[in-house]
A protein has these predicted regions:
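Mobile cofactor-carrier "swinging-arm" domains
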Residues: 1-15, 22-23, 80, 85, ...
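N-terminal, Lys/Arg-enriched amphipathic/low-complexity engagement segments
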Residues: 1-47, 62, 212
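Short, well-structured beta-strand-loop connectors
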Residues: 48-62, 81
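Short coil-to-beta-strand transition motifs
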Residues: 68-76
Length: 450
């Protein structure tokens, strides 16, 4: 019997520009780049030089602290640049792609005949292991500690997020192979949404399926971990993006690294929002250049509007990116009387505007403005209304700001990731950058416990 967990807290933000279940072609590109910052908590050591020839699956850089964790090139070709920033920080490794792609053959493997160590070794050798994250700290993991459990969330419910069921179509076999491989390492939990009906999800084998019924952020893997089996101090669990599970399955089924994924190009500033097949590291310009309604006063986001990163068309599809979104920047708006003027087209959690009368199906075109400056933190219970976790969000944020490590541990910082506070940041009257604050707290704890 499938376990069903109903979440009463949360908030759905219905934005204009959801991607239709249609595909468009973004074509092949001359250059691709792998960006180390996509793999949080990992310090890269570049293992190629400009002019080197690489195949798909060859390592471009490794984790400096654990060099057996490699990061594979998404394309074959010639390394054209290793771009560095301040203090020689590696920003990206750029590869000029071949017209005909060549692959490293890692050999097909029958997952049923492998044990957990063999699965981990295969992922390490192919440069895919770094796509696995961990709690605590919400960073790219390393193989030196065996996880207590592995969690996969197939529910993407952030505003304008890509529909994983649409991406799963045609990849069911690889997805199941990836799940079976992870189950060899540790007990694996698959979280799905109450509205998801794909048999590859509802009938997934070798894993424990849990249905989450509730508003955003029910799809956050951290929320699911907290509601299924919370993380205690000293424990480690792995969290895996469902697309990465497909990557793993392709490796075992074909013996090759294949980083193709379906990316939603969405937002109110996109003409005919839809999906396109793209590679990790593909230039964002190839996805949006024919889709942008205008080129000025637009905020491009590598990810969704709540947890994604501000980017430009010259940036590249991230390692965990399932959508590229475009919303109004808001820097050309001049509103008479500001928020005081009654209106019907603005979203309000507190029902300050009359837009709530139009029901939950009304779509909004929100821009990137914060609409207010940072101010003193008010203990109002705002966070708890949109945070379906067994933690005291406001008290945890205060402990992080104060740098009180003991208090942070007591309040459950080991269970959270920055994205878990995305909605709290959206509704916060104090205009605090909560995700950034949580990231600072996690980095502080990680350094303290190193």
């Amino acid at each position: 019997m499938v376990n069903v967990i109903k979440l009463r807290k949360g908030l759905n933000i219905n934005l204009k520009g959801k991607a239709a279940r249609q595909k468009f072609s973004s074509g092949k590109c001359a250059q691709y780049a792998l960006v180390p910052d996509d793999f949080v908590g990992m310090t890269p050591k570049v293992v190629v030089r400009e002019g080197d020839t690489v195949k798909v699956g060859d390592a471009l850089f490794v984790n400096k602290k654990q060099t057996d964790v490699k990061f594979a090139s998404p394309v074959s070709g010639v390394v054209s640049a290793v771009v560095r920033g301040d203090r020689r920080k590696v920003l990206r490794v750029v590869v000029d792609a071949d017209k005909e792609q060549q692959y490293v053959d890692f050999g097909q493997k029958q997952v049923a005949s492998l044990d957990g160590d063999a699965v981990v070794k295969a992922l390490l050798d192919a440069g895919l292991f770094g796509y696995i994250n961990q709690l605590p700290y919400a960073v790219s993991t390393t193989p030196d500690r065996k996880p207590r459990a592995i969690f996969v969330s197939a529910l993407r419910d952030m505003p304008l997020a890509g529909d994983f069921e649409f991406e799963l179509d045609g990849n069911e076999r690889d997805f199941q192979t990836g799940l079976s491989a992870l189950a060899k390492v540790a007990k694996t939990y698959l979280g799905i949404g109450a509205q998801q009906t794909n048999a590859a999800l509802t009938g997934a084998k070798d894993v424990e399926v849990t249905v989450f019924d509730g508003a955003c952020p029910a799809g956050n893997v951290g929320v699911q971990v907290n509601n299924i089996a919370p993380v205690n101090k000293g424990e480690v669990v792995w969290t895996v993006d469902p697309t990465a599970v497909i990557f793993f399955g392709r490796l075992f089924n074909t013996g090759k690294v294949d980083l193709r994924r379906l990316v939603a190009v969405a937002g109110s500033e996109i003409n005919e929002p839809a999906y396109t097949e793209a590679l990790v590291g593909q230039p964002i310009s190839s996805l949006v250049e024919s889709k942008l309604a205008k080129t000025e006063h637009v905020r491009l986001i590598n990810g969704n509007p709540l947890t994604g990163r501000k980017c430009t068309a010259a940036d590249f599809v991230g390692g965990h990116t399932s959508e590229i979104t475009a919303i109004p920047e808001g820097d050309d708006v001049d509103e008479m009387l500001g928020w005081i003027l009654p209106r019907t087209n603005d979203f309000s959690v507190s029902r300050s505007y009359f837009s709530w009368l139009f029901g939950k199906k009304k779509e909004y075109s929100l821009d990137a403005r914060v609409k207010g400056g940072e101010r003193h933190m008010i203990m109002s219970g705002e966070y708890d209304k949109v945070l379906p976790m067994d933690i005291y969000g406001e008290y945890l944020i205060k402990a992080i700001i104060a740098g009180d490590i003991d208090r942070m541990e007591q309040l459950g910082i080991y269970e959270v990731a920055p994205e878990d506070f995305a909605l709290a940041e959206f509704v916060d009257s104090s205009k605090l950058e909560l995700q950034h604050i949580v990231r600072q707290g996690l980095d502080m704890l990680r350094k303290e416990n190193a």
